[in-house]
Amino acid sequence: MNKVVLAGLALILVRDCDIGGPRFHGQIKGTWGGDNAGLMALDTTAHIHIGCTAGDTKQAIVADEQGRFDTPGRYNITLYPVARGPDHPARFTGSTDGHVMTLTVTLTDTAVTLGPVQLELGKEPQMGPCPICRKPGR
């Protein structure tokens, strides 16, 4: 075979491959933990902590076909040691392959952004001095 035919076959094979590897899509569930961050995802909501701050989504977190998500919710950046409020409107954005997640919290009424943080499914969050709530909405 000549080189042009081989190059054409190689391009066809590469086009049909998923070079980025498998991606997770669908509803995110379970406990995800990292350094000074955690996420507990249930059927209808999720509870997120980054440092001494926390918030909840208004719905389940669902990743698209690329493993990306963008979910609305509320977030309190003045939570610890005494919750002073208010809860700010927020967007919880990121991506996952189903085992590792990158998460960013953006308050939509201020210029505050937390993260990105990296979380692992099934890993206990390592929160340091700030406690983590065990139930969303708490």
Q: Model-derived features: where do they sit?
A:
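Bacterial Sec-dependent N-terminal signal peptides
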Residues: 4, 11-27
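Mature extracytoplasmic/luminal segments of secretory-pathway proteins
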Residues: 14, 49, 127-130
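Edge beta-strand at a domain terminus
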Residues: 19-20, 55-66, 100-138
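Tryptophan-anchored aromatic micro-motifs
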Residues: 21-40, 71, 103, 126, ...
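Residues that act as N-cap/strand-start positions at coil-to-secondary-structure junctions
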Residues: 26, 33, 42, 55, ...
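N-terminal glycine/threonine-rich, aromatic-flanked beta-hairpin/loop signature
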Residues: 35-77
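Short, cysteine-centered beta-strand-loop-beta hairpins and adjacent loop/turn segments enriched
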Residues: 53-55, 77-86, 109-113
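An anionic, turn-rich surface loop/hairpin at beta-sheet edges
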Residues: 71-95
